[in-house]
């Protein structure tokens, strides 16, 4: 499953939102990736997510693949919205 989001957090996906996303993604067995500007990272890796340098207004994609992919996609969407990280495009 793939969803596209736009970052609304004024400081982008920095340490705090990255930590929240990684924590949520780590609850699932599925492969969960985040893609920005042609680069892809494992959403379960704080260093990978931070290295992408996703700023406010940027579009990024989250892909989930595996046994619990649908549940993972819903959970990640909920975190992105509830934490003010971004909104689904």
Task: Report residues per predicted region.
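Absolute protein N-terminus
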Residues: 1-3
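Compact, glycine-rich, soluble single-domain proteins
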Residues: 6-56, 64
